[in-house]
Amino acid sequence: MKFPWLLLVKGAASVAAQKPLATSGSGQVLGTFNLEDIINASPLLSFHRDIVKIPSTTDNEYEVGQFIGDFLEQKHFTVEKQSISDSRFNVYAYQGNNSLPDILVTSHIDTVPPFLPYNLDYPILGGGHEFDRQSVLIAGRGTVDAKGSVAAQIFAVLEILEEKPDASIGLLFVVGEEKGGIGMETFSKNPSPSSFHTVIFGEPTGLNLVSGHKGVIGFNIKATGRAAHSGYPWLGKNAISALLPVASFTERLGEIPFQDGGLPSSLKYGNSTVNLGVIQGGVAVNVVPDSAEAIFSVRVAAGTPDESKSIITREVNKFTKNDPNIEVAFYPGGLSPTDLDTDVEGFDIITVNYGTDVPKLAIHGGGDRVVKRYLYGPGSILVAHGEDEALTVGDLEGAVQGYRVLIEKALSRDV
């Protein structure tokens, strides 16, 4: 039996064959055809629209969590709302009493700020171009990262459960991925042995299967100076001036060969990359600044976080000649590169530079049991977090099929 929403999608595709004449200022109407008709005709696209329209920047996920939980309950899932705080919770859903599923399908429901409203558009490609429904562009914060994955995962699971009602699949949608990963860490605190033999993570991968991603560490460099009147700067010591050279040097550590003192690289992930994301200091333009700080994020291509921390500390001290007024401090934790499974045919394989919740999901017990971990999803990371975040109808619908392939492979696994 086919899902009714698949029939609606086919109906929308036939209607969409009309040739567009023009686009309005809102980007919503093409000649006599309204792009919203395509969205309204598809339960998948409508659900995606509904959750994207709900602002859910990190720490403000309550409303979208409620919406997703209610939707899954209407689809006869048992839904647990795992509390993070009074106004934040993970959504964990499964069939009946099967709270320990074999397969876990997961993504995150928080987004980075600022909220950007949902919008539809269509690229006009010139005369004679036939309307292509799959090229309709869906824009807004979270369309890609990661509400595209959330929607596609849910509808892929619904399709499979329609065909195989006894399939042992759970859905987990966590908060806080964009800021520290508290949602996945909270889910992982359950000390009971993990039941799942396969976990499918959703992030924007361009419909490619990811073989791994870099690790990450964060740190700051602080400079201490001496305040003075700006008219007599020689009476003080400018902390910003002291900080800038070492900050610039540190930013280049990923480009320096490892044997020459740089950060590690690997054939799989390439160079480690260093981002100088924040620099701050001083209190007023007429005061010599007595303090300054530079904050860095490193995407680590090889080795452990501690190894990279040692390199950074050593090279900063060497560059500053052990200046006691320049200090390096690392933020707690850090992650090594994460390798993932790619043993499913039909996908292109890539690596990515961004971090995910994958290493934050703890696997408890099980002895030598191998848990497969896959990372896949619609949309490009190159537009995620930006003002032009968007994906196409084709991306979203293609992801449903991709998730189906991954889940079907997991269901056939002999464990």
From Swiss-Prot:
One of its GO terms (cellular component) is extracellular region. Keywords: Glycoprotein, Hydrolase, Metal-binding, Protease, Secreted, Signal, Zinc. This is Probable carboxypeptidase ACLA_013260. Residues 1-17 form the signal peptide. It comes from Aspergillus clavatus (strain ATCC 1007 / CBS 513.65 / DSM 816 / NCTC 3887 / NRRL 1 / QM 1276 / 107). It comes from the Eukaryota. Pfam families: M20_dimer, Peptidase_M20. The active site is at residue 177. Its EC number is 3.4.17.-. Zn(2+) 1 binds at residues 145, 178. Its main location: secreted. InterPro entries: ArgE/DapE_CS (IPR001261), Bact_exopeptidase_dim_dom (IPR036264), Peptidase_M20 (IPR002933), Peptidase_M20_dimer (IPR011650), Peptidase_M20A (IPR050072).
